[in-house]
Amino acid sequence: MSTVASKMSEFYVFVYGTLKKGEPNEMVMADGEGGRSKFVGFAETCRPFPLIVSTQFNIPFLLKDPGKGRKITGEVYIVDEDKLNALDELENHPHFYVRDLETVVLSESGETKDVWIYMLPEWREELLLNGSEFLASYNSEGAHNRKYVDRYLRTQQLEKAGHTLIVEVRQPRT
């Protein structure tokens, strides 16, 4: 298993939601946009996780609760440090999502890779109660019938309401 690519400044990243090809934020993974990236292939997590679509903005959330849910299918990329930092900023790591190493199996070769994956470490119970069923794969136009709301639109709505997505989603620390 390998965590980094051939160069020390390159990392494997697994994306499962709106960053996948054909999804609303696919441009983030484009090579040269905030760093270098290269598509490696499709993959599936070795362990199951809860993947849901929830909140009024229909955001896909991978909950850090291994062993529950389903094995998740997604895409693996090799990224440089600049792209990894850009992804950390996008995912608000470590304040909202956390970036952890998980093992995936590449679909084409059957090879296993340790990859970085962004997960929600804690959440309010309402996130599950109001969310979709556990998914194995996310598609913004999927059978869950929950159309994704773009970031700029939800930021405007949250600002008008006077709070943030973190307040809506994350369980307060005790």
Predicted regions and their residues:
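Glycine-aromatic micro-motifs
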Residues: 2-174
